[in-house]
Amino acid sequence: VTSFASAYLDDYNTYLGNLKLIDSNIDPEEIFDNFTIEIKDVSGEEMSTSAFLVELIMSISFTYIIMAITLAAVNMATSAIAVEKEHGTLETILTLPMTTNELIMGKYLANVVIGSIASLIGFVLTIVSFSISKNMFILYEDFSISFVAIVWGVVICILASFLISGVATLITSSAKTYKEAQAAGQILNYVCILPIFMSYLEFTVTTTYYFIPVLNYTTILLELYTGNFEYMNLLITIGSTIVYSVLIIWFMFKRFKSEKVLFSS
């Protein structure tokens, strides 16, 4: 009752103020409406508030999918490398009939598997959530998913796991202890948050943007599910990820040849 009375008195106060302005031959709109708000997408086209909210929520959802890969990969890499270095068990493992490259490749692929599982679980939950919301909220009534978009989305999630797992392995390999590895992995976690802040900025997405790891994954996933994607940008994202992943694997093999990296304590 109190809130209702306060709202009524506030409206009545505004009404009396407008009457005084009109009596003085002053248009109230010229006094109170000093600026207008227009919401536009990254292409500069005006969009409705509901469309903006849906795009923002989807951007945050896909960012969390990439973050899931990062968290899983960093934790796995920390356990597989930093913890074993701290406990001195890598020397024991290398007494087995395997090369250093085989050992590192196995740990890297384990990171990829864990990252892929985490991302696909998040991906499925996101799609299911939006599908359910479509039947419950007017805000999502225009949301639709094609089979092609789902397939490409799965491909992007798996490819992102290859790249992010490689970066996580490289970052944590320099650490001597579990705590150092966790601290180093936080850098990668912070990078994955960038797409959320980028969604608030007004800028034009160019072709170069799809060569930037992490940022391109969130963008291409968002475009896939808003129906605004181009196959050229999709191919650039896939191609650049493959190239980056190969370079990271090559650098890992070269880096882990050093005994200081393998057995630092």
Regions found by a protein language model. Give the residues of each.
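Membrane-interfacial helix-loop-helix connectors in multipass membrane proteins
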Residues: 48, 126-152, 227-228
